[in-house]
Design a protein with these regions (language model features):
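Catalytic-core signature of thiol
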Residues: 1-244
């Protein structure tokens, strides 16, 4: 069982989101900055990244967030997500070592917050905010854009059902970062009827789930966010003429 940079263990190397909570984040709430009206909305993400067996979910999920709007920066790739986002976030986070060449000790993991700082440093975003309630997450998805979340992944979540729906039962197996890119007030799922769901783009390739995506019931998203989770919102996205 791999040990991560903060001393915790993960049952799957791909799951290496570390928890880093800063009390100052409470001063940067998204509430009041986006309309509260909820509507069905999917933010297009024409990039499908695959972290393989690398523990670089923060780099890949933030790269998906940077790709999920019309005029996104072109050329974002697996190597960019790993080397330019994940490795650089590790060099600037609170823990020793990393997965980059020459790191000592050499091990995996970084935080959603450290990934946000790197995206801001590169100029992909002007700033970032936080959603501290499920209502604010849904309002953001309905009216503003994607949401980067850090959560505990559970052993039932590795394979969605044929319709793309995830089950959150089971035990924690590791921390994961993933891009939430849509919200549907009603979507029909065979055997479940119409559900209120969010849509997520995972970083396990286009063949995973439903074209690389999965769905969560809104109440399930609320449950996992309340379980040491976090929801970070990129603000003021920019298309860069050249990748860092």
């Amino acid at each position: 069982m791999p040990t991560l940079r903060d001393g915790t263990d993960t049952q799957d190397r791909r799951l290496d989101r570390l928890q880093e909570f800063d009390d100052r984040s409470k001063d940067y709430d998204i509430r009041g900055l986006v309309p509260e009206t909820l509507k069905t909305k999917t933010w297009q993400c024409p990039v499908w990244l695959d972290q393989g067996q690398e523990g670089a979910c923060v780099g890949f999920s933030w790269s998906h967030c940077a790709s999920a709007y019309k005029d996104h920066t072109r050329g974002i790739s697996n190597s960019f997500a790993e080397q330019k986002v994940y490795w650089e976030a590790q060099k600037n986070d609170p823990w020793p070592g990393g997965a980059y060449p020459g790191a000592n000790p050499h091990n995996d993991g970084t935080s959603v917050l450290s990934g946000a700082k790197i995206m801001q440093q590169y100029g992909f975003i002007d700033s970032y905010r936080w959603a501290f309630s499920i209502d604010d997450v849904l309002a953001t998805l309905s009216n503003h854009g994607v949401v980067e979340i850090g959560i505990w992944w559970r052993d039932s979540m590795f394979d969605p059902d044929p319709s793309g729906l995830l089950d959150i039962s089971g035990q924690h197996v590791g921390g994961h970062a993933i891009c939430v890119r849509g919200h549907a007030l009603k979507r029909r799922f065979p055997g479940h009827g119409e559900l209120h769901v969010v849509r997520l783009r995972n970083s396990w390739g286009k063949t995973w789930g439903l074209d690389g995506d999965c769905f969560l019931r809104v109440e399930d998203l609320e449950t996992i966010l309340n379980d040491d989770g976090e929801a970070c919102i990129p603000m003021g996205k920019h298309s860069l003429k050249q990748l860092p």
